[in-house]
Structures are given as C-alpha cells and as structure tokens.
Regions:
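Structured alpha/beta reader/binder surfaces that contact nucleic acids or chromatin modification marks
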Residues: 2-191
Length: 191
C-alpha cells in the first residue's frame, strides 16, 4: 500500500520538524485537479521540495539552494504529520495573527492569499494545524518523475513496516495543546 506525501519547501519541512512551525498554508498548485487544493489527507509524510526561491520567502531558517530533484536521486523523508484541523480563511487579519506559528514572510502569504486559481477565489487561503512526528530513522527511496509537478499531494512507495513504532513528536503534548488552543482562538476570531 502506498503512502501519501505532502510536498512542502525543504526549509518549511525543517521548521515543522524542529517545532518552529505548526501551521501549513496552501493555495494550490497548477496541477491540483479540477476542484483545486484541499486538505484531503489528515495524515501524511512531509516530502521536501527544492524548487522556488525559498530563502527570500521565509523569515528564518537555513536555506541551502539546491537544484530540483533528479530521477534516481535519494529522497529522505524525516517527518510524518497529522492535521489537527484544516480551514479556509477569508480574513487577512486572521492569517496575519498566525505569524508566531510559521516562518513564511507576510509578502509570500499575501501573494498566496490574493491569488485566484483552480477552486479558490482571491482573498482566501487554506491553513491546517499539524502535529509533526520525527521518524527514528529517515525513510529513503529514489526520486521518481511522478513526484514532480505543481501539486501538493503525491503517492509515495510503501513505507518501512516499522515506521509507526518509531515516531517521536517534535513538540510535547502540553506545548502542542497550548498551540492548538491559541491557533483555534485565532481561527474562530476570539483573540
């Protein structure tokens, strides 16, 4: 059985994996399908991407510009995520209020928020709160052409049989519950 991968900038995967980021924003890629993007999966591996100009798009984090993945190159999956909640925000002020929970620049978020594409109107963006877990050993497999393209969800090979037993949360339960409460208040507009 294959696993689902969520494509995200490598620097953001690192921020999620270190606990510096807890929310994921998405507008959708060109190849998201007729209805556009949705957080259709609630549990997924974080698949690090290397394209786009990541350094100018984040407020913090070490960015080493690398060329796009090449077929056959080893891909290293280090994190698994579970979405606690996912919503579409139409209120820019609520997007801005989530600033402590991610590393993206306001400009990048504004561009995504204002973009009108498949299934999404301007002045909206998808956001999900995710609980991230570190795999005890990175899961490595060769990059395939099917992983490319401007889309968020990809089918990955079958993961190692013992991967679930080795998961460690990157943020402890109490800290995550605090973040969940704080972000939930922002989403509901009860700041």
């Amino acid at each position: 059985m294959s696993a689902k991968g969520f494509k995200e900038w490598e620097v953001v995967c690192d921020a999620l994996g270190s606990g510096r980021q807890s929310v994921i924003f998405r507008k959708g890629g060109i190849h998201e399908g007729r209805d556009g993007f949705s957080f259709a999966e609630r549990a997924f591996f974080l698949f690090p991407t290397r394209f786009h100009h990541q350094a100018a798009s984040v407020r913090e984090g070490r960015v080493s510009e690398k060329p796009e993945w090449q077929v056959g190159e080893p891909v290293e999956i280090r994190y698994f995520a579970e979405a606690e909640w996912a919503v579409t925000l139409n209120d820019w002020e609520r997007v801005v209020a989530l600033e402590p929970y991610h590393i993206l620049t306001e400009q990048v978020l504004r561009e995504r928020f204002d973009w009108e594409g498949k299934g999404m109107k301007t002045s909206s963006i998808h956001v999900a709160l995710v609980r991230v877990f570190r795999l005890a050993e990175p899961w490595t497999f060769p990059y395939e052409k099917k992983f490319g393209g401007c889309r968020s969800w990809i089918d990955l090979p079958e993961p190692p049989s013992d991967w679930k037993a080795s998961l460690t949360p990157v943020i402890d339960q109490d800290a995550f519950q605090s973040i969940a409460s704080e972000t939930g208040q922002i989403i509901r507009g009860a700041r």
